[in-house]
Structures are given as structure tokens and as C-alpha cells.
Design a protein with these regions (language model features):
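Active-site/binding-pocket entry motifs
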Residues: 25-31, 112-115, 173
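Short acidic-glycine-tyrosine-enriched beta hairpin
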Residues: 72-87
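Amphipathic alpha-helical segments enriched in hydrophobic/aromatic residues interleaved with Lys/Arg
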Residues: 116-174
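Generic protein-terminus/edge-of-domain signal
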Residues: 1-75
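Ligand-binding loop in jelly-roll beta-barrel domains
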Residues: 89-113
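Structural motif
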Residues: 65-67, 83, 91
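Tight coil/turn sites that cap or link beta-strands
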Residues: 42-43, 80-81, 89, 99
Length: 174
């Protein structure tokens, strides 16, 4: 099962310094095909070939386990309670493993604000995995982001940017 929303960004939103392009949740069962279909162009990938995105994505695994690879990080185990950050221009692949599949949330974003954090060394392609454990606060933030994305109300991009900042802050601090 997958629920997701892809968003349109306008030039004024970009001036805010951080925009959100996608937010969603998926449950992958043991017998399910991964990745699931229904992703917009540029998002679907073959787990053997991987992909390169033009944005950051922050994923949170709430159940299950998997494996992550990128150009700078090889064969990193993923487990429930992990947040992992995908970087623009960075080849990567990941998928669930084990007997249980997994449940995950994601949010895709880009902008000068996040680029500056990478340049300052707060976020790095060499350390894309953060173990934060189970967090009802993080789940609530992802659910709020999905709700706001569905509404597409005026200034929703600014609210979504605040949610991303909160998620990244929790990831960095926990």
C-alpha cells in the first residue's frame, strides 16, 4: 500500500529557501514488489541499478529492515527507527529485506537552506543514516506534512518547509 502526493512549486516558493516536492507513506509486505508502482517520472527505480534524484529525500523506517547503498556509503543495514537522507546528484539504492517487509515515510525537498547545511558540514553523503529510534513526534510530522500537501492551501510550501526543518533538526539532534 502506498499513499503519496507530488507537489508543484512556484518561483515565489523557491525564494523561501526550501521547497517540498513529494511526501508519502508505504507498507511493503513480504510478497510485494519493491519499489511500488505509482511513482512520478524520475522517482521510480530498479533496485539493482539505483537512481539519482535532483532533490533531498528524508525517509523514516518504522517497521522492518533493509539495505542501503550510495556512491559514498556501501551495504549499510537499515532497521526500524532509522532516518536516512538521500542527496541530490548522489547515486543510491535501497530496499527492504528480511521476512517482514517494511513501513516507511518519506519527504522530498530542496533549496538553499539545506544546501547551506551540507556545505557547513551538518549533513554529509558519508553519514546518510541516523538511528533515532521510534518517535511518535517524527511520525506525527510526516502525517502533518502529508495532510498539508493534500490540502495544497496557500502558503502550504512554507508550512511544509517548517516541517522539513523540524524533521532534519530532530534527525540531527537525536
Amino acid at each position: 500500500m502506498q499513499i503519496c502526493k507530488y507537489l508543484v512549486v512556484n518561483p515565489r516558493d523557491v525564494q523561501w529557501g526550501l521547497t517540498v516536492s513529494t511526501v508519502g507513506y508505504e507498507e511493503i509486505g513480504v510478497a510485494d514488489t519493491y519499489p511500488t508502482r505509482g511513482h512520478a517520472d524520475g522517482y521510480y527505480f530498479d533496485i539493482d541499478k539505483g537512481r539519482v534524484l535532483n532533490e533531498y529525500q528524508l525517509l523514516y523506517i518504522t517497521e522492518g529492515e533493509g539495505i542501503f547503498n550510495s556512491a559514498h556509503a556501501k551495504d549499510i543495514p537499515l532497521k526500524a527507527g532509522n532516518l536516512f537522507l538521500l542527496f541530490p546528484g548522489e547515486w543510491h539504492t535501497y530496499h527492504p529485506t528480511g521476512k517482514n517487509g517494511w513501513k516507511s515515510y518519506w519527504i522530498g525537498f530542496k533549496g538553499k537552506n539545506v544546501d547551506d547545511r551540507v556545505k557547513a558540514g551538518f549533513l554529509s553523503v558519508y553519514k546518510p543514516i541516523y538511528h533515532v529510534g521510534f518517535s511518535a513526534d517524527i511520525i506525527r510530522l510526516y502525517e502533518e506534512a502529508y495532510k498539508r500537501a493534500q490540502e495544497e492551501a496557500p502558503y502550504s510550501q512554507q508550512i511544509l518547509a517548517g516541517i522539513v526543518n523540524h524533521l532534519v533538526g530532530l534527525m540531527y539532534a537525536l
